[in-house]
Amino acid sequence: MEFNSLLQLIGDEPIFDSSILLAGNVDPKLIRIQLSRWVKAGKIYQLRRGLYSIAPPYQRIQPHPFLIANHLQKASYISLQSALSFYGLIPEVVNITTSVSTGRPELLDTPLGRFEFRHIKTELLTGYQMIELSGQHALVARPEKALLDLIYLQPGGDSNVYLKELRLQNTEKLDKDLLRKQVQKFNTPKLENAVKEILQIMSSKSEEFEDL
């Protein structure tokens, strides 16, 4: 296959799986060799086995980190610090894209960034939504679920000290009823205690706003 043929086949898709090249009467070994050559030539990036992205200046669309993360591990969604930063709930700029997944924990370094996956139980793989990102789409935890996921996975995450260190802001974006509803799925005193602390933080910030 010629590289221009690959570009035509991929079109505007920012990420592609090698399986799309194996349709029809083709030799898988030759396809793998060709992909390896394109990687070495700097024409494509290998994100993980079988997963690739077109490299500049050939790419039509730069893949969003959230989209990449969704492809790196199936049954995953953006959560924790990445989602909280995306919603403006914490002030920090996050340099690693964090997700939760039913798969194994992983820390992946790719040509397009670093990606971390934390494991959660299958029954907790809820509370996410499809987000539009400049024409791309990715699964991202709702604000409330991103916060609960972080507290659940962080040792001592329910402590008053840790919650204050998060420096939560724009807490009006958090739905109190959703917090109370989603915490029931975790069924753990740790999260119940944390929600009480969060509601107090939200209340105090609301009072501060009213005093201005």
Give residue spans per PLM region.
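Short beta-edge/loop segments at beta->alpha junctions of small alpha/beta modules
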Residues: M1-A75
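Nucleic-acid-binding surface
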Residues: I54-L212
